[in-house]
Design a protein with these regions (language model features):
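PAPS-dependent sulfotransferase catalytic core
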Residues: 1-75
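PAPS-dependent sulfotransferase catalytic domain
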Residues: 80-132
Length: 132
């Protein structure tokens, strides 16, 4: 399977989308050069978050510009998993601006997601910064 340059990846907080992201990033051809010790959050026995997350007030805003997005990765080669809760609000723009890239959305029922999000730390997590 030929991977695109980017996969725009989104899910609600608590949907365990970050765990799915980590599984996808084990595939051959994925670029994980966005991972640094500062871009990691561990809770329970999980490394809950790894790599860059795009969002309002975060290190990288959810700006749909290829040069802006790509600067989060050290290496240019390989498929980049571009993670943001905000992509769900911009699906048409993503499809228009990045027609050859993929969009993946993770679904999990709302109350189950809400409960897991709070168990994993909610707004109090260290990375990424979700404080309002």
């Amino acid at each position: 399977m030929k991977l695109p340059e980017r996969i725009f990846f989104t899910g609600v907080p608590g949907s365990r989308w970050s765990g799915i992201a980590q599984t996808l990033e084990t595939m051959s051809g994925m670029n994980i050069s966005d991972r640094t010790p500062d871009r990691e959050y561990v809770h329970h026995s999980y490394t809950g978050h790894k790599g860059v997350y795009f969002g309002p007030g975060m290190e990288f805003e959810p700006i749909l510009d290829s040069d802006y997005i790509d600067q989060a990765w050290v290496e240019p080669q390989g498929c980049k998993l571009v993670k943001s809760h905000e992509w769900a609000y911009n699906l048409n723009q993503i499809r228009t601006k990045f027609p050859d890239d993929w969009i993946v959305m993770v679904y999990r029922p709302d109350m189950i997601s809400y409960a897991w999000w709070h168990e994993a730390g909610g707004f109090a997590i260290s990375y990424p910064d979700y404080r309002p």
